Amino acid sequence: MSNQFDQLKKLSTIVCDSGDPELVKASGSQDATTNPSLILKVAQEPKFQELLNEAVVWGIRQNGDDLQTLSFILDKIQVNFALEIIKNIPGRISLEIDARLSFNVEAMVQRAVFLSQLFEAMGGDKKRLLVKIPGTWEGIRAVEFLEAKGIACNVTLIFNLVQAIAAAKAKATLISPFVGRIYDWWIAAYGDEGYSIDADPGVASVSNIYAYYKKFGIPTQIMAASFRTKEQVLALAGCDLLTISPKLLDELKKSQHPVKKELDPAEAKKLDVQPIELTESFFRFLMNEDAMATEKLAEGIRIFAGDTQILETAITEFIKQIAAEGA
């Protein structure tokens, strides 16, 4: 029998969640995702120093002010790594805009357009790029505009059905519901209850979103993310896409146990589910009613923003070093 990774590839598109081009290559996945946290882990490794150096020099040459220069460099670093990664996969790469813009529609649109244009200018195929936008109300409005302009979006930091419905209404190409972070919240809030995989809150959330989308023929793709265990991954076999860390991908490759399709669009269409209409006020009310989604969305934005700031600090020091060497 083939290993679980190969079996799973027949049921879902496999996406490697890493900023390391070499790990993505070794993964054998179709697509890849990255974010500031993942880029931060690899950007300063000696083997990738040239990708960082080139981005810094390029950013300085754009002749912006200090803040603009940092923004240019951050986006160029992402694009540099993305172009290396897509050499090793047949599919798409997801890149993320600055999380500090999560509540500014105009700024998110401008940054996403710039990132897309830069990716193309450096030789990337626009059809292979997804721009990750946070699942705030403002982020989803930015997605609505960007999708209409032909820029494919991945709505990230999805923690409940409300966000998923809003993203679908905005015609998002794809959403990323975070299985593991939902699970983390429930464990922190109520203690380790020893959830069986059938009762896993993160798995249940993605299953509900999947059922709603397939019931109503919504074309937005679902890419389950943020897995803590191999069991969570397997419990969502059949989901459109699964973005998985290199560690869990290795675990799947080492197991020969059979993989069962857990999510089926035909079964979803049989469910007695009513459509939900969302206005801005209703969206905000329902998010406020969901403590988990509210807290994890805020936390996710803070984490990504914090990692971006750390990366900016490293870049600033590197710029000073270049200036000192040129003096």
From Swiss-Prot:
Gene3D superfamilies: Aldolase class I (3.20.20.70)
Cellular component per GO, a single term: cytoplasm
One GO MF term: transaldolase activity
Enzymatic class: transferase
UniProt superkingdom: Bacteria
EC number per UniProt: 2.2.1.2
Keywords attached to this entry: Cytoplasm, Pentose shunt, Schiff base, Transferase
Protein's cellular compartments: Cytoplasm
This protein's pathway: Carbohydrate degradation; pentose phosphate pathway; D-glyceraldehyde 3-phosphate and beta-D-fructose 6-phosphate from D-ribose 5-phosphate and D-xylulose 5-phosphate (non-oxidative stage): step 2/3
Species of provenance: Chlamydia pneumoniae (Chlamydophila pneumoniae)
Active site (catalytic residues): K132
Range of residues in the leader sequence: none
Biological processes per GO annotation: carbohydrate metabolic process; pentose-phosphate shunt
Gene symbol of the encoding locus: tal
Stored PANTHER family: TRANSALDOLASE
Protein name: Transaldolase
Protein's UniProt keywords contain Plastid: no
Function of the protein: Transaldolase is important for the balance of metabolites in the pentose-phosphate pathway.
